[in-house]
Every structure is written in C-alpha cells, then in structure tokens.
Amino acid sequence: MGLALVFSLLTTAAGLVVPLFTKSLVDGFSLQSIQPSTVALIVGAFLLQAVGGALAGYALSYSGLKVVASVRSRLWNHYLRLPVRVFDTRSAGDLASRLTNDTGVLQSLVGDQFPGFVTGVLSAVVGVGFLFWLDWQMSLVMLAAIPLVMAVMVPLGRIRWKTAQEIQGETARLSGLLGQVLSEVRLVKASGAEVRERERGRETVSGLFRLGRREGKVQSVVAPIMGLVMMLLLVVIVGYGGLRVSSGALTAGGLVAFILYLIQVVMPVTQIAQFFSQVQKARGATDSIVEILSLPVEDLGLLPVPPEGRGTLVFDRVWFGYEPDRAVLKGLDFSLEPGTVTAIVGPSGGGKTTVFSLVERFYRPDSGAVRWDGFDTADFDLTDWRSRIGYVPQDCPLMAGSIRDNLTYGIEGVTDQALWEAVGAANATEFISALPEGVETQVGERGVKLSGGQRQRLAIARALLRNPTILMLDEATASLDAGSERAVQGALDTLMRGRTTLVIAHRLSTVVGADKILFLEDGRITGRGTHGELLRSHELYRTFAEQQLRWRGTMEEESISDGTVAGR
C-alpha cells in the first residue's frame, strides 16, 4: 500500500506540473520561448504521469485484491467453525452466495474503484490548492457546485444501497435454489417437477431483473448529472475568467492553467462520485458478510481427552430440542460402559439420531451434560474429542474425489498397507480392485458412481482407519447382501472389541448381541436391558420387534421368545 501511495503521489505531481508550464508558455508566448528543455520537461511529465498512473493503479488494485482474499479466507474459515445449528437454518446456496457474490461486489469496489478513488482524491486536493493559489475568487465559484452535487448524489446513494441489499438477498435465494435443485436433480426428474422448478427459477430471475433495472436507472442518472454540473461549472468559470482577464486581475495563461487544473479536479471528482456510488452498493454485501462473521463459532474447548479405553460415556439428565419450545430428548439418563455395545431402538422420531449428534457435539444440551470419564465433553478440545469417534451413518455421505480421498478424509499419515487392511476388513477389496483405477477411482458428486452397499463399506473402512475409542453405527449393514454382511459384521465385531459402541438398529440380528438395549420413545427411555429381558418386560418392545425389526429368513421364530438368534 505504501508503494502504491508513492506512485500515486508521483502521478499527481507530474499531472499538476503541466498546467504551470502551459501558463508560462501562454503568458510569454514566442517562438524563442519554446526551448527544447521545456518541451522535454512537458513530455517527461506526461510520460511520468502515464507510467506512474499504471504502476499506482496496479499496486492499489493488488492491495485491494489482497484485502478481498483475506475476507474470503476469513469467511471460509468461519464457515468451517460454525455450529451445525447454523446450517440447519440457512441454505447452503445462501452461504455460498456470501462467499462468492458478496465478496465479488467488494472486489469490484476495492479492485476497480478504489485505485481511481485514491489517485482522484490526491489529484483533487492538490488541484484545488493550486486553483486557490491561481485565483481564490474563481475557486469559491467552483466550490459552490459541491452542495448541488451532494443534493443529487446523497438521495441516489441511499436508493442504490437499498437496492443493493435487495439484490444480494435475491442472489442468495437464487444460489440456494440452484444448489437445492442441482443436488437433488434425480428427485426433480423422477418426480416430474421440472415445470415447477422452472417456474421457481423464473420468478427469482425476474426479481433479479427488476432490481437490476432499478439499479441501472439510478446508475444511468449519475453520469449525466455529473456531466451537466461540470459543464455548467466550466461555462461559468470560462465566462467569469474572461471577465477577470479583461480586467487585468488574471493573465490569459493563468486562465488556461486554471481551466486545466479545473479539468484535473473535475475528472477525479467524477471518479470519487462513482466510488461512493459503488460503496452504497457494497454496503449491502458488507452487511451480509459482517452478519455471518458475527455468528458465534463452536466452543472448541481446551481440556485434553483422557487416554483411550478408560472412559464411561454418560448422558446425565439431558434435555435438548432443536426449537426452544419442542424438546426432542427429555431427561435422558444412561451410561455406556467401556468395551460394551449398546443398541438404541424405538419408533421413528424418538430422538435416536439426536443422541449421536450430541455425542459428536454438533449441538449442546439445553440442560444436563454428556460426560466422558466424569468430565463434561463440552470442555474437551473439540478436534481431539471428535478424533476419538468413528461414525458409520446410514446414508454414508462421500465427498467428490477418489476412493482414497474419501477413505483418508480427515485422517493424516495413512499408509497403503493400513488402507488396504481396512478395505479388506470392510469386505471392499473385491469391488475396489475391479474398478479400472482402483482406489484412485473418482466416486462422483456425493458418491453417485457407487452403489449404496459400496458406499457403506467405504464408510466402515474409514471408521476402521480412524481406530476410534467410541464407535457409533446407524444400521451399518443395512445395504449389504447376506454374504457381505457376515464378512463386515465380523470386521465390526473386531472393531467394537474394547470400544464403547452405540448402535441405532432396525434389524433384530443387530440388537440381539448387544450388551444393553435402550428403548427410546418420544425422547424418553422407557425400557432398558438385554433383548430377552425386554421381550419379557416391555410389551411395546416386543411389538416393535415383531413388526418393525427386519431379520433373515434363517432366523427361527423362537429367537423372539427366548432372546437367541440362530447362527450366533
């Protein structure tokens, strides 16, 4: 920035020297007065002005772009630290629009308009000083135009600011709609909803068009008004200056120099006016960015997590709701002993997935606490705590990239040997080896190039690579065939050994072998015990097992009555 200001000063100085040379030439004009040195000085001043202007413009633009890059980086890092609750209430498209469109408006301001503003201010300030030095009376006449310009520009600026805010909001809505439709394009096509989505898109685009037209009207008025004011000012100055010359109060060369300085002041003033017009537009974008940056980030915590294998995971009278007046978990109170498997079953909407979210610290309990080894998990270092958790979800999300990228996502220093061992344990070796590029095969957006069972096996392999202390499974084998399930279940049995494991289960085979079963109903635990104990003591569990849990045809009917499963 300092170098840019130096270049700007040199450019301004070079531009302001020319009218002085012109004054001397006009006042004492003769062929003898035109010396080669004078011509060389004038040419040198023009060259210095051109080169200095280019260097100053580049340096100022570079500095401005660095500022925008810093804002984008800060915004991106802030997104990564925002709690999950923020993403529950805001669309991904809206947040993406803040990072791309809003910062793009800032880039236009600081990268395109700011350089002209800085050089314009320097030229205008120094030029006005020379104008007062040449003739202070005509300078006062010139300054009389400022209130007239402000009377027009201030209301227009307010209109543009309000319009810019509406444009940013509408652009964010369009980005959100685009992200929603494109990410679920298969659902759109399968539902025959193209016409509906076309209409939604047309309405949003039409709204942007109307706002852009309003902004264009304001912008189209600015330049003509400024041009009219400056032309009137120039006519007045020339007329009044002619009277001053005829009266002898000002020389002809002084009038020429005054007009040249006036032009050098008028042109920067136009740039400054355009800059402040763009500032009004950027205010809307800036307000949105500041609003995002003001959102509180996740509490990272500082307490180190106790060594692996020591802790008991405890839900201590936990109450939680996604909305203030609607509790999802109601006084949840249970413990998971080290090395044991606990299965959570119950009707849909009872809060099973929410339990997982609280363990991961995606949300904080409204009251009560989730404890590990006697400590509130909210006090643990967040990165350390989550590194101790392995999660195999039911939908098994994947990132666009290769199979290797997804297996090692968030895990540093994974060797090929460790990777293939995990792949083998998850029964994924055969299908990965059959792919043309093996683990380097691209899985596509959200893993669309793989089947559900393949995605699930990759999620299991990723959990194996994490070597977690706490393992959370959301019906981890639901998408596998019988043969694959047996192989993967064996790998999971190995993985679960010595670890605290929590399973959301819909299959009878998954829950029968659990050390403890929790029946979660409407946010409360209404039954706990082994499969056999709950069959005898919990009527709703028995009904649920008969009607909702799916099991293989090889399982005998007596497995429901005595708590055993054939083949286990």
What are the residue ranges of the model-derived segments?
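ABC-type nucleotide-binding domain
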Residues: 308-568
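Hydrophobic alpha-helical segments in the permease module
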Residues: 42-53, 146-153, 219-233, 252-274
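An intracellular "coupling" helix at the cytosolic face of ABC transporter transmembrane type-1 domains
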Residues: 84-85, 101-110, 114, 118, ...
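Cytosolic ends of transmembrane helices, especially the final helix of ABC transmembrane type-1 domains
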Residues: 193, 217, 265-292
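Transmembrane helices of ABC transporter permease
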Residues: 1-10, 112-166, 237-250, 267
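Alpha-helical segments in transporter systems
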Residues: 1-20, 24, 38, 42, ...
